[in-house]
């Protein structure tokens, strides 16, 4: 299995058993009670996902941050009190870089985070990362784009044609989640 396939497989294992309860937290209060319930905060899901990723032989670490709705971390004196959740960094040995993800998402996506967690200052909690590289910007990890092509022709008083759309990044993840919700409601 490739690096990406291992991460997606680990994410799918998590999502078969667990659901996100809509809450963001920095730590898990009672992780042993979360698994039998089948749902938990993003911290609960991320701790479980880190464990699964490590079982797959991958290096996975928490990345602490302050959610967008809670304001930016001060640059001069970042405070522990301002940290209120975390995402996951997984190290790709072949590419010598990290990819980021969050267990609260419905669809497994590398380097695409919920908008609430897309911030310009987060800190990787890994003993292997040099001090000067522990602060990371997870705001611009992936391109968020949409391309639309319209082919139209006039037929009498009507315009007929075809539209095709290509989505990248957050746009694509949101579309996939909406399509999944439509299928689940049938």
Regions found by a protein language model. Name each.
Residues 1-186:
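A sensor for short, sequence-defined functional sites
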């Amino acid at each position: 299995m490739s690096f990406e396939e291992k991460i997606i497989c680990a994410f799918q294992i998590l999502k078969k058993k667990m659901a996100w309860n809509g809450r963001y937290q920095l730590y898990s209060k009672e992780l042993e009670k979360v698994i039998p319930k089948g749902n938990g905060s993003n911290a609960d899901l991320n701790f479980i996902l880190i464990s699964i990723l490590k079982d797959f032989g991958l290096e996975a670490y928490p990345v602490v941050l302050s959610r967008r709705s809670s304001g930016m971390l001060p640059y001069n004196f970042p405070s522990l009190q301002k940290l209120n959740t975390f995402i996951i960094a997984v190290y790709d040995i072949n590419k010598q870089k990290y990819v980021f993800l969050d267990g609260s998402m419905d669809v497994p996506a590398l380097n695409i985070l919920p908008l609430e967690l897309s911030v310009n200052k987060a800190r990787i909690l890994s003993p292997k990362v040099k001090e000067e590289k522990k602060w990371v910007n997870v705001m611009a990890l992936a391109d968020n784009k949409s391309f639309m092509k319209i082919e139209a022709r006039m037929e009498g008083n009507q315009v007929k044609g075809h539209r095709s759309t290509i989505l990248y990044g957050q746009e694509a993840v949101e579309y996939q989640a909406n399509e999944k919700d439509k299928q689940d409601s049938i």
